């Protein structure tokens, strides 16, 4: 009954600008026919429609890139450390060790689970964040992925927690835990969480086999939830807020902290904060971002007919196979166009142990997408690592391409490869092999 009420409310609140079909509620017999692998212990099921972000790390990059394009006087100081805040000057150290200072009129602290640490570094200790750890695993299970048929199963585990499983680039993404944590620098999916996910899958889908050998990648992060005295993590508000720390005698600028929030609401939250900043400066909004396309979403073909026309047009222009154009459009959106044009003028060579990722596209990313470290390419601009497609061989090939484009010497290239291997093992429980867990 609660699920039915919840789905009805979901439809009600989305009725004004509806773009998705209404929910359907399925009794046990119908639900088990639609999902034959699901446990017969279910009482009923519901179907509702939602959106998903297929490459959140890349979306972050595109937001930064679009911001730079919209405001030519802005700068993206990536991998820069806040080291001081004195006499109204905020000091930073860049990735090359160079130090510089900024005298801000206002600071927006969007550091997520690090918000309190940033506030302290700015001279104002706070306790705004009471984060919880959420872990996920990626499982190579073709039978499960096929049975999902593009759907996500959102279910209650045996202990009452809410979990989910859905198709992510041909793997089954399983999550998530909700464990109090305040250490974002050392978060990882631990053995207990992994066992919990496997046990939950076995309970939900008893006809299928699951074990640790099927896991190709894990990841974990801290939700920047507000500090709370709630007795259970699930009772902590998922709403967002933007508290203001007003200036004082030692800090002449205000700090606006972005507490809470998630991908579901990031555009609305950003709009609210931008309006708050404009109001403080006595200015009014000149441009609405509500319907502004982001990155590769600009001029993206809106339906299958438009998509086919786009692919045909640029396959003809570049003389590349339509399948290649389709692959890059799916991977990068309309940002694929300059990559396609570059491939058109070169001999296209695929990376070792891959079928669809070219040396040309990696070189283009290195030159054009604010790459500082090798990990930017394999963990953030592409999905090579999370897809299980990264190997010792293609990592070395990518490192050579990036080194050539960015002017690294052999010592720097070796350090970057080592750093990627350390991060993969420490944060993602991955030790690279000569062959991919999943070929791309």
Feature locations, PLM:
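Short arginine-rich
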Residues: 41-42, 280-283, 424-430
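C-terminal catalytic lobe of FAD-dependent flavoproteins
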Residues: 23, 58-62, 120, 125-174, ...
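Short, flexible loop/turn elements at secondary-structure junctions
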Residues: 50-52, 80-86, 94-96, 106, ...
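Helical element adjacent to the flavin cofactor pocket in flavoenzyme catalytic cores
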Residues: 46-106, 198, 267
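Dinucleotide-binding Rossmann-like beta1-alpha1 core, especially the glycine-rich loop
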Residues: 1-34, 163
């Amino acid at each position: 009954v609660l699920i039915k009420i919840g789905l009805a409310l979901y439809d009600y609140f989305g009725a004004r600008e509806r773009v998705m079909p209404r929910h359907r509620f399925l009794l046990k017999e119908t639900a088990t026919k639609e999902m034959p692998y699901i446990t017969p212990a279910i009482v009923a099921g519901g179907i509702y429609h939602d959106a998903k972000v297929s490459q959140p790390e890349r979306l972050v990059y595109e937001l930064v890139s679009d911001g730079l394009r919209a405001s030519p006087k802005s700068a993206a100081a990536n991998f820069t450390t806040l080291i001081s805040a004195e006499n109204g000057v905020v000091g930073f150290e860049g990735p090359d060790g160079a130090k510089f200072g900024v005298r801000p009129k206002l600071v927006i602290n969007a550091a997520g689970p690090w918000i309190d640490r940033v506030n302290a570094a700015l001279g104002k200790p706070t306790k705004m964040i009471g984060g919880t750890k959420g872990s996920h695993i990626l499982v190579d299970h073709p039978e499960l992925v096929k049975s999902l048929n593009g759907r996500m199963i959102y279910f209650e585990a045996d202990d009452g927690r809410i979990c989910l499983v859905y198709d992510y680039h041909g793997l089954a993404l399983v999550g998530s835990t909700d464990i109090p944590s305040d250490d974002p620098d050392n978060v990882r999916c631990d053995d207990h969480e992994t066992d919990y996910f496997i046990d939950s899958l076995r309970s939900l889908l008893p006809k299928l086999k699951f074990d640790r050998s099927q896991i190709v990648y894990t990841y974990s992060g801290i939700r920047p939830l507000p500090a709370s005295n709630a007795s259970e993590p699930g009772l902590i508000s998922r709403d967002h807020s933007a508290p203001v720390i007003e200036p004082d005698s030692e800090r002449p600028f205000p700090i606006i902290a972005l507490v809470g929030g998630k991908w579901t609401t990031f555009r609305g939250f950003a709009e609210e904060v931008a309006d708050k900043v404009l109001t403080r400066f006595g200015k009014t909004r000149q441009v609405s971002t509500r319907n502004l396309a982001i990155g590769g979403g600009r001029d993206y073909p809106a339906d299958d007919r438009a998509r086919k026309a786009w692919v045909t047009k640029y396959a003809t222009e570049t003389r590349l196979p339509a399948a290649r154009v389709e692959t890059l459009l799916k991977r990068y959106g309309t940002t694929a166009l300059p990559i396609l044009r570059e491939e058109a003028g070169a001999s296209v060579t695929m990376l070792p142990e891959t079928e669809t990722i070219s040396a040309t596209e990696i070189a283009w990313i290195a030159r054009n997408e604010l790459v500082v470290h090798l990990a930017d390419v394999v963990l953030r601009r592409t999905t090579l690592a999370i897809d299980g497609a990264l190997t010792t061989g293609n990592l070395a090939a990518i490192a050579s391409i990036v080194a050539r484009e960015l002017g690294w010497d052999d010592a720097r290239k070796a350090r970057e490869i080592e750093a990627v291997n350390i991060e993969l093992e420490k944060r993602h429980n991955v030790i690279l092999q000569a062959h991919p867990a999943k070929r791309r």
